[in-house]
């Protein structure tokens, strides 16, 4: 009943012209200079005035949880045995059409992957310079989305750039190791599109 009601509400919001620019799909966490900072500021201001903003505290907690969910799905898929796995990351910026990586989900993901002993190769149309400035060469950088998947065990789709939407899955599967998996942080793809690549999505 709750799921049906949630889908009904989501459908109503989607059909509202004044709300059509809102991010209402499940995603791997929100970043940027506004949302995380504003939520933290509101919580802090409320606390100074004696208020416990439980809803905003929950929003902040859930957003951080979403940034970790891709890694957890990846780890579970491989039964916890992920040391030495090579992974591709598609997208570094917190959203398309920018190189802004403030509070970006990709940073949380990269940190956890490296600590787990994984090898990371990332590509973003415009944010790789910013990523190098932030974390240097602790990961490798691909020339394009196809370059990142060579001998990779998994792909993380993190930022919804248009150029990631219609890849040649046959070419990608041949370039990857056996039994590859795509972890889709934007719920853009469908399992039937991937030509034999395992598919994990948000939600």
Model-derived regions, located:
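Structural/interface elements that position substrates and couple domains in central-metabolism enzymes
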Residues: 1, 8-203
């Amino acid at each position: 009943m709750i799921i049906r009601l949630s889908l009904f509400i989501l459908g109503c919001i989607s059909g509202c012209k004044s709300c059509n620019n809102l991010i209402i799909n499940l995603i791997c966490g929100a970043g940027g200079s506004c949302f995380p900072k504003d939520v933290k500021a509101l919580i802090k201001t409320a606390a100074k005035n004696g208020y416990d903003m439980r809803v905003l505290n929950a929003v902040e907690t859930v957003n951080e949880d979403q940034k970790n969910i891709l890694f957890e799905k990846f780890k579970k898929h491989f039964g916890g045995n992920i040391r030495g796995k090579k992974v591709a990351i598609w997208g570094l910026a917190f959203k398309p059409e920018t190189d802004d990586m403030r509070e970006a989900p990709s940073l949380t993901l990269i940190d956890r992957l490296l600590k787990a002993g994984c090898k990371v190769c990332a590509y973003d149309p415009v944010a790789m310079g910013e990523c190098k400035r932030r974390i240097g060469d602790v990961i490798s950088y691909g020339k394009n989305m196809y370059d990142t998947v060579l001998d990779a065990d998994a792909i993380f789709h993190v930022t919804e750039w248009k150029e990631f939407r219609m890849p040649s899955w046959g070419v990608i599967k041949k370039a990857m190791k056996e039994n590859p998996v795509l972890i889709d942080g934007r719920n853009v793809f469908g399992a039937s599109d991937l030509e034999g690549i395992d598919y994990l999505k948000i939600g």
